[in-house]
Swiss-Prot record:
Family stated for the protein in its record: Belongs to the EamA transporter family.
Tagged with keyword Nucleotidyltransferase: no
Protein name: Uncharacterized transporter AF_1552
Annotated SUPFAM superfamilies: Multidrug resistance efflux transporter EmrE
Signal sequence residues: none
Species per Swiss-Prot/TrEMBL record: Archaeoglobus fulgidus (strain ATCC 49558 / DSM 4304 / JCM 9628 / NBRC 100126 / VC-16)
GO cellular component terms, semicolon-separated: plasma membrane
InterPro entries on file: CO/AA/NH_transpt, EamA_dom
PANTHER family assigned to the protein according to its UniProt record, in alphabetical order: ACYL-MALONYL CONDENSING ENZYME-RELATED, MOBA-LIKE NTP TRANSFERASE DOMAIN-CONTAINING PROTEIN
Subcellular location: Cell membrane
Classification via Gene3D superfamilies: 1.10.3730.20
UniProt topology in membrane: Multi-pass membrane protein
Length: 270
């Protein structure tokens, strides 16, 4: 009973994390600056936001934490590069191909593929396709998007492993701290920013808070189920585009959004 309750909290944490991450385009478009500058600002201000909560729980990083920090950095940087190089919808679609890559990785980890996963995954991905309407040209933006999806899948797997030994605060501390430290020299020499206020918001709302929630949830949720729950992010991103940027939503997109929501509910249901 206790584990069931923890699993529910874990799933809710991942869904809430995805909702907050769905606002990232608002901040990225208002911050200004090149890809690496925006990536640094996101990681750095996120790191500062969690730092006061991590001072007593730093510890020494092991290989899992270091690997997680590397792939998390690669995911963030390649996704921002994709957003700046191609259609936002296409970048989001390629990032959220991660569930496809996660399933074989979860099998290698010894997880049994659940029936609900086999039902929820195609439903969610078809809905994602309908909602985001991809384009066929192979550009640098698409390549960055493919890289972001592959690295994001590895982030799910390594997060699950890291939570066996580390707290969400420690994981987030190294995820954000090591990434921002690696980019600090670049930012000091070449960095530029359009709005510091938006940069701070970028570090807190779609970064620090959802990163902690995501790390918490991964302890209690199966690797194969977590990225399906996270498909709620592009759905929220579409709603942000509609309400904040004034973008239109077609009937096809609305059907796609409903399919994503149905897939998430199937994955969530016990």
């Amino acid at each position: 009973m206790v584990w069931f309750r923890c699993m529910r909290y874990g799933e809710a944490a991942i869904v809430l994390s995805a909702v907050l991450m769905g606002t990232v385009s608002v901040f990225v478009r208002n911050v200004g600056g090149d890809t690496l500058s925006v990536t640094f600002l996101r990681l750095f201000f996120g790191f500062l936001a969690v730092l006061p909560f991590c001072l007593r729980d730093v510890g020494r990083p092991d290989r899992t934490l270091l690997g997680l920090a590397v792939f998390n950095f690669l995911t963030v940087a390649s996704y921002i590069a994709a957003i700046q190089s191609t259609e936002v919808a296409m970048a989001a679609l390629l990032l959220y191909m991660a569930p496809v890559y996660v399933i074989p990785l979860s099998v290698l980890m010894g997880e049994r593929v659940e029936v609900k996963t086999l039902l929820a995954l195609p439903l969610g991905l078809i809905g994602l396709y309908l909602m985001l309407t991809p384009y066929a040209e192979l550009t640098f933006g698409i390549i960055f998007g493919i890289v972001s999806g592959l690295s994001y899948a590895i982030v799910f797997v390594l997060s699950k492993e890291a939570r066996k030994k580390h707290s969400p605060w420690r994981i987030t501390f190294y995820n954000l701290g090591l990434g921002s430290a690696a980019l600090l020299p670049y930012f000091l020499m070449f960095g530029r920013v359009g709005s510091w206020l938006w940069a701070i918001g970028l570090g807190v709302v779609p970064t620090a808070v959802p990163f902690v929630l995501f790390s918490y949830g991964m302890k209690y949720v199966k690797v194969q189920r977590a990225p399906i729950l996270a498909l709620i992010e592009p759905l929220c991103a579409g709603l942000v585009g509609y309400f904040y940027f004034g973008e239109t939503l077609t009937l096809t997109q609305l059907i796609g959004g409903a399919m994503i929501l149905a897939g998430v509910l199937i994955a969530w249901r016990e």
